[in-house]
Amino acid sequence: MAGTGASPTEPVVKPLETRATQEDPGRVSNPLQRWTAASVYPDMWADPDQDPRNSEGVSPDGELATLLDYLANYRITLLMKCEGLDAEQLARRSVPPSSMSLLGLLRHLAEVERDWRGWFVPGEPPTRLYGDGDFEGAAGDRAHVDEAYSDLAREQAATDAALAEHPNLSERLGAQKIAVRELMVHRVEEYARHCGHADLLRECIDGRVGQ
């Protein structure tokens, strides 16, 4: 499965009603009241018929297809963890003392996608999108949010296109002679790691949980 699935501006799943706390009206207080929209598998984010990920379909054949499928699913998961939140919530550093936010993750992964191309595409490495401010500069306004979604989609597509020219996983690319296989595994690892961060960030914002 390719692409990122649902539009970042339209929630994949309509949020359920939650019981808020007096301190933070957007967050669930009792761990037993943590909520998910899933009813078929309560540990999931959404039910299968509303989940754009390839979680119940036939698994792909071949190593490259499997890696691409995992990458696509983790990309979608990141967007799902951001759905239904306003700009302030997306920029909220909800797990102090970390400076991470969901918006910061979108910006960071756009930067990482851009950096990966510098490993193997001939020419000068691409300049950084946000300097050193992918997390620190993640401001809670609509313009920054729209920019981050646009940047991420563009950089993902550019890296996908560049790597599509190298389907042999054993081929070594760039000055460092990195194997395509290593780069593909690293891409999956990067998104998987940050989806774990997104789990905690989202739960601390409004209590919503689920794979």
Indicate residue ranges for each PLM-predicted region.
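Short, contiguous alpha-helical
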Residues: T21-Q50, N54-E56, L64-F135, L173-Q211
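Conserved small-residue motifs centered on glycine
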Residues: T4
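Acidic/histidine-rich alpha-helical segments that form the ligand environment
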Residues: D134-E171, E182-R187
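Active-site rim elements
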Residues: D61-L67, V145-D146
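Intrinsically disordered, low-complexity segments enriched in serine/proline and basic residues
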Residues: S7, P11, L16-R19, G26-S29
